[in-house]
Amino acid sequence: MACFRVILYLSVIFFVQCVFAAPKGITKVAPENHNFFGRITSYAHPKDVPDPVPMYQQFAALAQQSNCHNYHINISVGDATLLYSWGDNDRNQRLQLFHSKSLGIVASWAGMNPTKINSILGAADVFLVDVDRRYFPHAEKGAKLYKGFQDAYKRVAPTFIKELQYYQELYNEDRVSLTGLSYGAALANIALLHVKKNLKRGSIYRTVAFGLPRVGNQEWANSIDKHADGKFFYVANGNDLVVRAPPRELGYQHPSGQIWINPSNSSNWKFYPGQENVHGANSEFGYSIPDHTGVYFRTEIASLWGHCPATVGKD
């Protein structure tokens, strides 16, 4: 049954994307937004990334580090020190908290563990369900989330918020940042609204998610845009399959904030304003798993097979 769910999920993604695939190299001149099955699509032209590249490199290294099986508290990754780790990276995705000189207290979640069935099943539980208002009371009316991701976040949420508040006080730190790869990127996305509601001090400095799948519907994407205050970014590398899944045709929608590295693993990156920008990753039809676990801002994020400990800007 477990294998069937995974196979069905991947088959649906492939079929729907083949049927509705956008043509390569969109050049249409149109208003900034138009409707796609009632959802927003941006035609805004790309811009330079809004922050210094070293900031994204530090985020990328911390997104990689939470995937490492061998680690110890107080390990250094760039300008950050590991403070806390939780989860078995099977039923519970590994969460790690760092103190970074440039980013504040950083929460990083590991990506899906392909060697553990519960991690795979959580990622395959793809149905959209209503947001749990106990955690997300400020989400827009009608907001829905990917069931497997919401369930995974709810398991870690009480511990996460408690430890986050503790380390903010311990380090007298007002900045909070969120990151992760893949499954972990989805949890960083979901955490944003819950963290903002529960902060006792400070604010969310940045959220930078790598290889982010679509996590919710249009109303969830709108909620991220509203509450992120322009500080949420997700990075797509080349033809990464995961960033294109689940398909929009199933009701899913990315929020604003895409940075697209194209070609993959290169130093050519641009910021694509608005939701589901046609000039960004959606403009090319292709599926690549190697691009998912690739090089982001000259920093490898390769899950179990990447640098451990993670390195910053050396790839």
From Swiss-Prot:
EC number(s) given by UniProt: 3.1.1.-
Active-site annotation: S182 (nucleophile), D240, H292
Secreted recorded as keyword: yes
Gene Ontology molecular functions: hydrolase activity; metal ion binding
Chief site of localization: secreted
The reaction(s) this protein catalyses: a monoacylglycerol + H2O = glycerol + a fatty acid + H(+); a diacylglycerol + H2O = a monoacylglycerol + a fatty acid + H(+)
A biological-process GO annotation: lipid catabolic process
Family classification: Belongs to the AB hydrolase superfamily. Lipase family. Class 3 subfamily.
Protein name: Secreted mono- and diacylglycerol lipase LIP2
Protein source organism: Malassezia restricta (strain ATCC 96810 / NBRC 103918 / CBS 7877)
